[in-house]
Amino acid sequence: MHPQNIALLTDSCADLSPRMIEENHIFVVPLRILCSDGEYLDGVNIHGADIYERLRAGELPQTSLPSTEDMEKALRQIIAEGYDGVIAIMLSSGLSGTYNLARLLAEECRDTIPIRVFDSLSGSLGQGLTVLQAAEDIRNGMDWEELTEHRIPKLIANTFPFFSVDTLEYLQKGGRIGKVTAVAGTLLQIKPIITFADDGQLQSVAKVRGRHQVMDKLVAMTKKCCGEHKRYNLAVANGGAPAEMEQVRQKLMQHCRITIISGMARSTEH
């Protein structure tokens, strides 16, 4: 299979900008966002800024996996454009049924086009960077077997997302932590540093007090992961906190020998 005939498929939780999607010829299936006034398609008719505005107004939008119809539509488009194979890198199965949906449809299409579906065990830019690196590898001529058997599993195993939240309210409402923990954490200004566990579930790996300590801890943990590696892809993003994101980015640029760093704010990029 010629590398240029390999299609990349992901979902909207990869948080890739329209420019990145277009330049890398990536096919994206939107997750569904359930709001008080109806259902929306993530990245199509609702965006990060809209969701954060609703949260500030007291609403709690719910996410749902992409519809079967939208996933099938993307696969039909890939086939119509003449691709010989599909690599799908989806949102962590620990958070969503998107990966399992893609696997089911891949099985149904096995006689039409080969599809390898990967559980990113991550989300947002952790997932997105894996997709972008796979796109670069395809452009550089990496073949199907090398990509699917070695490269992408290695990328997934060596992706380390870290993030924090300013309030524990939404983790509590989403069932990620208990109400008592949320109340105590709020009173003490405790901010968890969260990552993805080996099974793709969210996991708290540190707790600090105050927003400034959050930024320092995020930088320290990122530096530890980078270690002495000569090349790594590094991205920063924010959920309605662009000023804090920029501070983290600046700190990382001071302390890390960065090959690639992308400042992407889902709350502002439509």
Model-derived features: positions:
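Class I S-adenosyl-L-methionine
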Residues: 39-88, 92-110
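Mixed-charge interfacial surface used for oligomerization/domain docking
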Residues: 2-7, 13-27, 32, 38, ...
